[in-house]
């Protein structure tokens, strides 16, 4: 989202919203404004889309419609289509709205489901609670760049996408109470939790940092590794809690471009539940960094025992 850049506010917009969009068959959209008449919530509207400047592989697109009672979320419900993985080789079905979604999802904004969470049913969640296992929820709006393969020979040549995260005060407090450690469900949770540590490091250096300054840059963890060497996860998390207290905030909202690759030193995640990922993906780099040199052994075992890969595939619990 660009105008406004908050997901919730953008979905609530009436008459106008702007996004950075990946556009298929771009050559067919020479110039000018596209127009479509449609019916939303029983009311006829005219929707226009104007293509703006290019930002890498995306374009600024300005959406406008002529009914102030219709929100952008209403338009997406009618005009949009659930983006299921392309390797399924089929069109989206109505049932996907339920099956390609976690049972605990609440906030709209991701372009893909956090598929490690698909394995968790209400019964499993209840069983975990009965065993005294604390469950906390956080938000990372998965960006389209998560599907972008690593094509460069060197990891330095790959540019990570920016994703927006939200973490509540209660979750920060729970993490501190558990010595700054957690089991992450899915790589989305991993990226969010590890980003928290580096946000805390930023706040320890600059307690008055703005929301923009809290953004975790792609190579930030590696650039600050030496100065952050003696900062524990609890200390970093406490800095975030102090920041929330000072600004009388209940939720931390910021963004991350973190890339987790071999050589990364995990700070908060002590175990992770994750599916099996495809070659040339940043997700496989993340797993490799976590299990060190054992990722080939793990994946050879999965292949040798006919495990299913990717979104609707089997899962694993990784403990380094």
Report the location of each language-model feature:
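Surface-exposed, charge/polar-rich loops and edge strands
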Residues: 1-320
């Amino acid at each position: 989202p660009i105008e406004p850049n908050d997901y919730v506010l953008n979905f609530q917009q009436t008459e106008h919203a702007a996004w950075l969009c990946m556009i298929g068959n771009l050559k067919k959209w020479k110039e000018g404004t596209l127009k479509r008449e449609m019916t939303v919530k029983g009311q006829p509207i005219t929707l226009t889309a104007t293509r703006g400047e290019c930002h890498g592989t995306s374009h600024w697109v300005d959406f406008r419609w002529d009914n102030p009672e219709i929100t952008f979320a209403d338009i997406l419900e009618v005009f949009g289509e659930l983006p299921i993985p392309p390797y399924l080789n089929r069109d989206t079905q109505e049932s996907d709205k339920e099956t390609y979604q976690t049972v605990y999802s609440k906030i709209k904004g991701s372009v893909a489901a956090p598929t490690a969470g698909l394995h968790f049913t209400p019964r499993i969640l209840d069983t975990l609670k009965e065993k005294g296992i604390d469950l906390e929820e956080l938000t990372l709006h998965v960006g389209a760049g998560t599907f972008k393969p690593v094509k460069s020979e060197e990891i330095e040549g790959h540019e990570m996408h920016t994703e927006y995260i939200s973490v509540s005060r209660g979750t920060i407090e729970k993490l501190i109470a558990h010595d700054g450690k957690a089991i992450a469900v899915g790589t989305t949770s991993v990226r969010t939790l590890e980003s928290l540590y580096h946000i805390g490091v930023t706040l320890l250096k600059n307690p008055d940092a703005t929301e923009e300054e809290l953004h975790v840059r792609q190579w930030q963890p590696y650039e600050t590794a030496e100065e952050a060497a003696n900062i524990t996860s609890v200390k970093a998390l406490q800095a975030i809690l102090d920041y929330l207290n000072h600004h009388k905030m209940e939720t931390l909202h910021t963004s991350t471009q973190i890339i987790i690759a071999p050589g990364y030193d995990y700070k908060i995640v002590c175990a992770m539940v994750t599916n099996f990922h495809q070659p040339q993906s940043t997700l496989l780099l993340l797993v490799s960094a976590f299990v060190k040199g054992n990722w080939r052994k793990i994946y050879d075992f999965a292949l040798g025992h006919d495990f299913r890969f990717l979104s609707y595939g089997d899962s694993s619990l990784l403990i380094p």
